[in-house]
A protein has these predicted regions:
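Short, solvent-exposed turn/loop segments enriched in Gly/Ser/Thr/Pro and often Arg
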Residues: 85
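Long, acidic (Asp/Glu-rich), low-complexity accessory segments flanking structured domains
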Residues: 1-42, 49-81, 89-94, 116-183
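A surface/extracellular/periplasmic glyco- and lipid-processing/surface-interacting theme
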Residues: 95-115
Length: 183
């Protein structure tokens, strides 16, 4: 099954300085519907609380407040899988409370969007799974693959092009996911 790594990184960053990080932080150019039409069935969504509300993020990059329309679209597609990450890299001051908020929010999403299979819920700072995944995810993207120093400078788009043909078996196997940049 094809999965998109950092699914929502096609969105525009909210802070001006984030534009300088696009070669390394942007992992998708296609919007949600185009990703789905290209065969993506597994979506990687990252959240963090910023100023008291949930935001779509990728590490330090803020894409703005969580828009529930995203989940409605995914639910309408039907038979899709979502991995939700609490993308807080460093351990917060009150980690247990933060995890409780995350799990409560996850429960809300699961109940509101029955067309989505929430397959994974990870708290980033401890990389701990809070759901039991049914699908084996093969990470095949810029942040996990070994690369030469000059490949790092070229960014995620170059690297996605370089590894585009890898993991074809996982894409054709419904029990596995090849998580890729720039699907």
């Amino acid at each position: 099954m094809l999965g998109s790594h950092n699914t929502l990184s096609y969105l525009r960053p909210k802070k001006w300085w984030a534009w300088f990080t696009i070669p390394w932080s942007k992992c998708q150019r296609k919007d949600l519907e185009k990703q789905y039409l290209c065969g993506v069935k597994y979506f990687d969504i990252r959240l963090r609380i910023i100023k008291g509300e949930w935001h779509f993020v990728h590490n330090k990059i803020d894409y703005g407040p969580e828009d529930l329309f995203i989940y409605q679209c995914l639910s309408d597609f039907g038979d899709v899988y979502v991995r939700i990450l609490l993308d807080q890299r460093e351990k917060p001051k009150y980690p247990e409370e933060y995890k409780e908020l995350f799990l409560s929010h996850l429960n809300f999403l699961v109940n509101c969007y029955p067309g989505i299979h929430f397959d994974s819920a990870i708290v980033f700072w401890e990389w701990k799974e809070y759901l039991t995944p049914q699908i084996n995810v093969v990470e095949n993207h810029f942040s996990v693959k070994p690369k030469k120093w000059w490949e790092y400078i070229l960014g995620t788009r170059y690297f996605a092009w370089k590894v585009r043909k890898e993991n074809q078996d996982e894409i054709n196997d419904p029990s596995m996911v090849a998580l890729k940049d720039f699907v």
